[in-house]
């Protein structure tokens, strides 16, 4: 499967997972996250990406230092993402730029005000229909 089909979602998920890493991780946390990120080399939906990710892990391993804090793990995911961006000719981001982009991506989109417009329009329509039914019913009773 082409990275263009799933890449943005994979990166968003990876960064979100890193942001969910404990600030002060336990040894169990470290092992679980190490296993999680290490397993990408076996499950990415692109064969070339699996090979490249394994190479990136060899060059930029998930060390005890990386796993010592949330900040370090988030920076590591940004570093790995930047390595991929370098090889794919995309812009590499500083940590502040990357964190801003990640937070923007993870921020829920506000619902359009058009939704409220249509809800109000439907309510007004229902009120008009009920009023017209009332007038018709009242005229039939008066006959």
Swiss-Prot record:
Reaction equation(s) it catalyzes: 2 R'C(R)SH + O2 = R'C(R)S-S(R)CR' + H2O2
Keyword Chloroplast part of the UniProt annotation: no
Disulphides: 46-49
Protein name: Probable FAD-linked sulfhydryl oxidase R368
Protein keywords: Disulfide bond, FAD, Flavoprotein, Membrane, Oxidoreductase, Transmembrane, Transmembrane helix
Pfam families linked: Evr1_Alr (PF04777)
Keyword Lipid biosynthesis in record: no
InterPro entries referenced in this protein's UniProt entry, alphabetically: ALR/ERV, ERV/ALR_sulphydryl_oxid_sf, ERV/ALR_sulphydryl_oxidase
Alphabetical list of PANTHER family matching this protein: ALR/ERV, FAD-LINKED SULFHYDRYL OXIDASE ALR
Native species: Acanthamoeba polyphaga mimivirus
Broadest EC class assigned to this enzyme: oxidoreductase
């Amino acid at each position: 499967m082409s990275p263009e089909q799933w890449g943005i979602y994979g990166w968003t998920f990876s960064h979100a997972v890193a942001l969910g890493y404990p600030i002060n991780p336990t040894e169990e946390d470290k092992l679980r996250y190490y296993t999680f990120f290490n397993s990408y080399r076996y499950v990415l939906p692109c064969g070339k990406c699996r090979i490249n990710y394994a190479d990136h892990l060899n060059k930029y391993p998930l060390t005890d230092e990386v796993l010592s804090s949330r900040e370090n793990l988030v920076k590591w995911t940004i570093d790995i993402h930047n390595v991929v961006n370098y090889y794919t000719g995309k812009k590499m981001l500083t940590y502040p730029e990357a964190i801003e982009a990640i937070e923007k991506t993870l921020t829920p989109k506000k619902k359009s005000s058009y939704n409220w417009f249509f809800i109000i329009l439907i309510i007004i329509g229902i009120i008009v229909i009920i009023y017209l039914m009332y007038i018709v019913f009242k005229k039939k009773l008066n006959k």
